């Protein structure tokens, strides 16, 4: 039985759930200002059915890819923009490819990209004041753009050295027996460890505790941003403590590991600047460049070890997961293709020709691997995990015009969110013949017959890190991904190492019954066009790696004095790359039902107690000021709505509201535990 003093909390929770989950999330977010604008554009995914708007927004969680494809074929190819519904947020206006150049030519004063990213990531709430400062003054991204890209030749040897040690630890070097691995999990560890060799140094990057807590932190921050976006702005400060509690321990461990090293590095750098005779030699890594950039700003706050740690964590958050997913897809696409044998033979021939034996590979040598480059670029085209790209917000108070959409030109008012259908562009038959087929050498021209001794194919298009109007994985234009050159170098290094030292054979049958019935939940919630998505990365619409297992043997000929044994049978199995696994579906259904039941319970109790007369024994009545008690005892008590408002804002309500909102996140914890349980069951 519910206690009397819980009345205000129950009423407050009913309002919170009703407003947040019904009015804000389910209803179409069309302001009065933009209602006429949205009515003048075609919509995708809308059907002639009851509650069409709400059902369309719910449907985008699982069908965003189909909606974008439908809009591309029906409208984009005829130079017409279309509206893509969104759940919990305003809809997207998807521009046709014909407007891409004009779209990218607009100045930042007209189309802002920072506001969109801040809204999607919710840095202020998910990463606190330090994270917000790091996003506002992005020294870490400036360092990557200006110094890491330029100094790649200097760090290439360290990358290869760490990559070799990582493969030894996670894939093994057994030349006799094959080893079973989880491809996605091990690729994430290898990428994280190798990248952090350049980010922060060898000591920290080899700490298993740091790698594990960094993975959990990155995973939880992404999910927290998705959840916080579901709530109205005025409610986000209230729900943030409950959402961020899941990864506070992970953040604390990462800080505990990094802060002493960073503090020591800062002191050594300052002493080196003061004493030219100091024998300490500054390492060549991102941390050192960050410290030097902070010193150039003449701001002592920038040298705070906690802030520098947050910058490194943010750099990991935005780079590691996408790179890990991309290289995992590349391996799966390559070894799972119908022509895998011929592709791998060509890649092995190129690696044998271009890469020396028993030496650390340089950047110049990797730049010659045009087939490796093409194989990864093709995988990123076929298995992209973003349905829409280049998000922008119209910031010009007078709006912007697009002449390329026809006559009359398209006028977009301020506040509208724009994007382009990247996934559909990557699969456009007009740009890529046979676009659904993985062709590892699509971007390479093989030497023609009679052309002489041309043993190395010439690249057909630009390198992996180069963006074009038809290749938007890294974005395009002046705001393209600043770390794409480093990511491309790392992925080429990984794939070349695998091709050089391991053979992969695809098994035709699942490993066991458990593998066929269970699917591994992904290590992060994909962002996207809805509440469970970010910039077009939907929870179920994007290509998903589910069970990717490898069996391998190490080719010891490169490092050991034994004969080469190159047989790494690898099994790559995915029941359905484009559908959610059954465990995740079941957990999501249970979570939605529980939330609906709690909302109905709170609203029902609130309505009942709203009409229940107050009396002197009621705890809520005793909290009423004396001057108001007479009014409540008068004949003809106040209307029910007035009682409702009073009970909502009675004293000491704030902490009770937080307590009741916590119930909702306990349900989310159950949903999250189901995802982890489905992963642990299989492992």
Curated annotation (Swiss-Prot):
InterPro entries attached to this UniProt entry: Cyt_P450, Cyt_P450_CS, Cyt_P450_E_grp-IV, Cyt_P450_sf
Signal peptide: none
Enzyme Commission numbers on file: 1.-.-.-
Subcellular location: Membrane
Annotated binding of heme, by residue: 481
Biotech / industrial applications: Due to their effectiveness as antifungal agents, echinocandin derivatives can be used for the treatment of human invasive candidiasis.
Biological or metabolic pathway of the protein: Antifungal biosynthesis
Disulfide links within the chain: none
A cellular component annotation (GO) from this entry: membrane
Regions that span the bilayer: 8-28, 588-608
Keywords (A to Z) from UniProt: Glycoprotein, Heme, Iron, Membrane, Metal-binding, Monooxygenase, Oxidoreductase, Transmembrane, Transmembrane helix
Residues carrying sugar: 29, 581
Cofactor(s) needed by this chain: heme
A Gene Ontology biological process term: secondary metabolic process
Membrane topology label: Multi-pass membrane protein
Entry keyword annotation includes Iron: yes
Family: Belongs to the cytochrome P450 family.
Stated role: Cytochrome P450 monooxygenase; part of the gene cluster that mediates the de novo generation of L-homotyrosine from acetyl-CoA and 4-hydroxyphenyl-pyruvate. L-homotyrosine is a building block of echinocandin B, a fungal lipidated cyclic hexapeptide that acts as an antifungal agent. This is followed by isomerization of 2-(4-hydroxy-benzyl)-malate to 3-(4-hydroxybenzyl)-malate by htyD.
The protein, known as: Cytochrome P450 monooxygenase htyF
Lineage start: Eukaryota, Fungi, Dikarya, Ascomycota, Pezizomycotina
């Amino acid at each position: 039985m519910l206690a009397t003093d819980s009345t205000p909390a129950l009423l407050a929770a009913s309002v919170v759930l009703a407003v947040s989950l019904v009015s804000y999330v389910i209803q179409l977010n069309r302001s009065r200002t933009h209602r006429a604008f949205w009515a003048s554009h075609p919509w995708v995914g809308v059907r002639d059915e009851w509650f069409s708007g709400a059902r369309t927004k719910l449907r985008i969680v699982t069908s965003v890819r189909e909606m974008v494809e439908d809009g591309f074929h029906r409208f984009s190819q005829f130079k017409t923009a279309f509206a893509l519904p969104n759940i919990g947020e305003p809809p997207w206006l998807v521009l046709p490819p014909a407007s891409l150049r004009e779209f990218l030519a607009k100045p930042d004063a007209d189309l802002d990209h920072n506001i969109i990213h801040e809204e999607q990531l919710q840095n202020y709430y998910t990463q606190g004041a330090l994270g917000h400062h790091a996003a506002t003054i992005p020294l870490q991204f400036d360092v990557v753009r200006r110094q890491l890209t330029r100094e790649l030749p200097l760090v290439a040897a360290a990358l290869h050295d760490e990559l070799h040690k990582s493969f030894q630890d996670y894939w093994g070097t057994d030349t006799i027996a094959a080893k079973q691995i989880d491809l996605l999990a091990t690729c994430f560890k290898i990428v994280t460890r190798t990248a952090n060799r350049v980010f922060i140094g060898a000591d920290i990057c080899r700490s298993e505790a740091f790698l594990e807590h960094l993975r959990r932190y990155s995973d939880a921050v992404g999910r927290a941003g998705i959840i916080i976006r579901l709530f109205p702005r005025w409610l986000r400060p209230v729900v943030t403590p409950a959402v961020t509690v899941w990864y506070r321990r992970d953040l604390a461990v990462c800080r505990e590991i990094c802060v002493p090293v960073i503090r020591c590095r800062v002191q050594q750098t300052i002493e080196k600047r003061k004493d030219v005779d100091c024998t300490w030699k500054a390492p060549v890594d991102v941390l050192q460049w960050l410290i030097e950039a902070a010193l150039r700003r003449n701001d002592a706050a920038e040298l705070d070890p906690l802030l520098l740690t947050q910058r490194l964590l943010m750099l990991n958050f935005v780079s590691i997961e996408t790179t890990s997913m991309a290289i995992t897809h590349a391996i799966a696409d390559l070894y799972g293709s119908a022509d895998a044998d011929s592709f791998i033979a060509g890649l092995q021939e190129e690696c044998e020709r271009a890469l020396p034996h028993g030496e650390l590979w340089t950047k110049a040598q990797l730049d010659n691997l045009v087939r490796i480059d093409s194989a990864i670029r093709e995988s990123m085209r076929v298995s992209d995990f973003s349905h829409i790209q280049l998000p922008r917000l119209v910031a010009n108070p007078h709006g912007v015009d697009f002449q390329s959409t026809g006559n009359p030109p398209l006028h977009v008012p301020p506040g509208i969110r724009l994007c382009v259908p990247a996934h559909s562009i990557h699969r456009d038959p007009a740009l890529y013949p046979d676009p659904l087929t993985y062709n590892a050498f699509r971007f390479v021209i093989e030497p023609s017959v009679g052309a002489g001794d041309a043993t190395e194919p010439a690249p057909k298009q630009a390198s992996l890190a180069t963006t074009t109007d038809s290749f938007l994985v890294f974005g395009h234009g002046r705001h393209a991904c600043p770390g794409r050159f480093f990511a491309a170098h790392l992925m080429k290094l990984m794939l070349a190492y695998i091709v050089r030292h391991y053979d992969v054979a695809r098994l035709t049958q699942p490993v066991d019954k458990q593998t066929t019935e269970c699917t591994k939940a992904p290590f992060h919630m994909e962002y996207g066009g809805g509440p469970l998505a970010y910039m077009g990365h939907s929870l179920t619409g994007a290509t998903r790696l589910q069970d990717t297992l490898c069996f391998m043997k190490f080719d010891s000929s490169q490092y050991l004095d034994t004969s080469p044994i190159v047989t790494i049978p690898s099994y790559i199995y995915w029941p359905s790359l484009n559908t959610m696994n059954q465990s995740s579906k079941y957990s999501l259904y249970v979570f939605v039902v529980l939330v609906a039941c709690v909302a109905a319970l709170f609203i029902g109790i609130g309505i009942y107690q709203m009409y229940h007369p107050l009396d002197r024994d009621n705890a809520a009545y005793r909290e009423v000021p004396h001057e108001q008690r007479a009014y409540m005892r008068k004949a003809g008590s106040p209307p029910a709505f007035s009682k409702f408002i009073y009970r909502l804002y009675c004293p000491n309500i704030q902490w009770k509201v937080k307590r009741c909102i916590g119930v909702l996140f306990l349900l989310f914890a159950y949903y999250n535990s189901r995802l982890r349980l489905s992963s642990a069951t299989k492992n």
